[in-house]
Amino acid sequence: MKKKAVILYSGGLDSTTCMAIAREEGFEPYAMSFDYGQRHSVELATAKANAKTMGASEHLVVSFDLRKVGGSALTADLDVPKEGIGAGIPVTYVPARNTIFLSFALGWAEVLGAFDIFIGVNALDYSGYPDCRPEYIAAFEATANLATRAGVEGTGRFVIHAPLIAMTKAEIIRKGLALGVDYGRTHSCYDPTPEGLACGLCDSCRLRLKGFAEAGVTDPVPYAVRSKK
């Protein structure tokens, strides 16, 4: 019988590839997505449409409103930067987002009897978010085994899998294509147009387009503008 794994699944390029990797490694995926008041809710609609296609046995969407907290261009009335990828932590960082997401995933994993959680964080072609680093993943894994009944009673050890963390975006794309991922059914933009098109200029779009260019593949997603940098 396959081992269950909870996959943090946004509907974007990285999390979709992560789901495909979990399947390749023999896990039964249980997808978890979040409706947290994000301005790029097109991505969530993509996740809802494609979770079953990607092989998820279940798809759980958790709703809460981080707009009440604010502090990010994704959850507050702040402009999403379009000038290019800068230094430092950008305004698109959502305070403690991955900690919140992983905590929900940990709770569901414990209920499911799953000890494996997959998250598509990346520390190479990324925007500089502090909760995408290897040391953060290691620290949360340690916390997971201290903060749960299963961890304390020793019935199992939780593992946080971050298979993309040391891969370039081009390597991620090549891996996904080798596993049959249809990237035309993913969405990564932070600030889509009213029609749902990727803007092509935010950090996420720039990193995605750069990855496809370096992989020698055309991105199948339509863009309002296709950034060259």
UniProtKB/Swiss-Prot annotation:
Cofactor binding mode and count: Binds 1 zinc ion per subunit.
The entry's keywords: ATP-binding, Ligase, Metal-binding, Nucleotide-binding, Queuosine biosynthesis, Zinc
Listed GO biological process terms: queuosine biosynthetic process
Co-factor(s): Zn(2+)
Keyword flag Nucleotide-binding: yes
Superkingdom, taxonomy of origin: Bacteria
Amino acids binding Zn(2+): C189, C199, C202, C205
The protein's enzyme class: ligase
Reaction equations catalysed: 7-carboxy-7-deazaguanine + NH4(+) + ATP = 7-cyano-7-deazaguanine + ADP + phosphate + H2O + H(+)
Binding site for ATP: Y9, S10, G11, G12, L13, D14, S15, T16, T17, C18, M19
This enzyme's EC code(s): 6.3.4.20
Pathway: Purine metabolism; 7-cyano-7-deazaguanine biosynthesis
Gene Ontology molecular function: ATP binding; ligase activity, forming carbon-nitrogen bonds; zinc ion binding
One Pfam family linked to the record: QueC
HAMAP family registered for this protein in UniProt: QueC
Purpose: Catalyzes the ATP-dependent conversion of 7-carboxy-7-deazaguanine (CDG) to 7-cyano-7-deazaguanine (preQ(0)).
Family: Belongs to the QueC family.
NCBIfam families according to UniProt: 7-cyano-7-deazaguanine synthase QueC
Name of this protein: 7-cyano-7-deazaguanine synthase
Native organism taxonomy: Bacteria, Pseudomonadati, Thermodesulfobacteriota, Desulfuromonadia, Geobacterales
Gene: queC
